[in-house]
Amino acid sequence: MSRTKRPVRWITAAVIVVAAAVGLYLFQPWRLVTTDRVDEAPPAATGQQGAAAKPLATGSFISHEHDTSGSVEVQQLEGGKATLRLTNLRTSDGPALHVWLSDQPVKQADGGNLDDGKHIDLGSLKGNEGNQNYVIPAGTDLNKFSTVTIWCERFSASFGAAELKQRA
């Protein structure tokens, strides 16, 4: 092997190693096979033990970029506070997953529109399976936000979404 080819091979190997490391960091492919289960208790409407929260709106997830299922419920708590409850959620794990309320409608085939209008980020997804609660900020007009989505911020993609239907 000539001396001029050795540096080229070392540089090529270094570029491949760096590209692989960056790709692993960005895409986190191991998250496709990991599960993070959460089982939070439902919030109580009052300080009285056993009191139930009042349901304001409900919906069921449909799949977008990844298979997603489960139900959502907006619940009225003591003092006018509201919470979003995800029940029996099942979706893929992924990088930078958040729970959003969106003012955009749910589309069956694609959730790419859900970041087009206004949205409220309720926080990072606590787990890709199970039951979990998210506080809805005070002053949120739930008539303007009719969709819940599991949103991947890194890839600007909806894993799944649910249309909120107001309860009478």
What would you call each of these model-derived segments?
Residues 9-25:
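Hydrophobic membrane-insertion alpha-helices, especially the h-region
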Residues 137-160:
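Short, exposed beta-strand-loop hairpins at the edges of beta-sheets
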Residues 163-168:
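Extracytoplasmic/periplasmic copper-protein system
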Residues 25-80, 114-117:
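Transition segment at domain starts
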Residues 71-72, 82-87, 132-136:
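N-terminal post-signal-peptidase region of extra-cytosolic proteins
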Residues 98-100:
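Beta-strand signatures of extracellular beta-sandwich domains
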Residues 1-6:
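Terminal targeting segments of Actinobacterial cell-envelope proteins
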Residues 109-137:
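An anionic, turn-rich surface loop/hairpin at beta-sheet edges
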